[in-house]
Amino acid sequence: MLKKSDFHYDLPEELIAQGPLPERSASRLMLVPSAPEQFQDCYVRDLPELLQPGDLLVFNDTRVIPARLFGRKVSGGRVEILIERFLGTHQAVVQLRTSRSLKVGNRILLDAGGHAGVLGRDGDFYLLSFDVESPLEQWLSDVGQLPLPPYIHREPDEYDRERYQTVFARAVGAVAAPTAGLHFDESLLARLRARGVEFGYITLHVGAGTFQPVRVALLQQHVMHSEWFKVGAELVEQVRSARARGGRVIAVGTTVVRSLESAMRHGELQPFVGETQIFIFPGYCIRSVDAMVTNFHLPESTLLMLVAAFAGRTRILDAYYHAVQQRYRFFSYGDAMLLFPRNAGEQ
């Protein structure tokens, strides 16, 4: 049985990107073809030459909300609030960071004005009701702070409001960016269109749970967090058309893979709107995509396990070793890979 430790690798701290490059598509791109072909060191801007006319790139069009708030308990202790998802106009599921857990009925006095009351708790998540001057989503857009990942050791600035967002983001609701999409700028998208590559979109609202570690030794015991997603009829038809013409379906990011796999019914992609808790790790056969663009993921993370299921665990760990040796930049603001699937029987 696979263990969490089977997905460990050593990463020097200085390779964790603390901010974006000046140009989105200037990030490096490691080409990881199916074995035994060698890895190639490229750039994201090389994608038009690496893809083929008729290929379909599938993006996640979720938009990150400024979901981080600060306040204090009535007793005076500081509280950090991270919105996970909205429930109506004035309620939200949140994560709280505070010295002591809050209980149902407790109030939080918000630094930006107004207050929030604790209505309930489920594990790491709290249900809060907000007494603020406008609907919560609108109010957050004015006063909220962008929630950068915990491995970025600085406060967010105005530049992050632009760069920790894809250029095609439109469906408001994520608290973390679908980071593979951050590499695509308008110039690159135009060159891909000119190459004959088509674009399709799903929506998956990335939750704060994406940063939660696997806390069990055996993978089969892990329970994934739930995230809302939508695969529309238009995208389903685009996928069918791409397959019919011999094009490849290429996921831009693990969120796209999780959405497409969650919408598979009897071996066919179907329109779907709802929640997914799908946990993809080696042993699972990914059938919805032919290739994947993805960033480099944390050791022992569920995202690393997903890409290992697609490309092979040994192959991925070898690629990560190569990335460390070649000084690639890691995680959300880091570099990317173009992955192709493992061969049958490859571990």
UniProtKB/Swiss-Prot annotation:
Disulfide bonds: none
Any one GO CC term of the record: cytoplasm
Pfam families per UniProt: Queuosine_synth (PF02547)
InterPro entries: QueA, QueA_dom1, QueA_dom2, QueA_sf
Protein's cellular compartments: Cytoplasm
Top enzyme category: transferase
The entry's keywords: Cytoplasm, Queuosine biosynthesis, S-adenosyl-L-methionine, Transferase
HAMAP family reported in the protein's UniProt record: QueA
Official protein name in the record: S-adenosylmethionine:tRNA ribosyltransferase-isomerase
Provenance organism: Xylella fastidiosa (strain 9a5c)
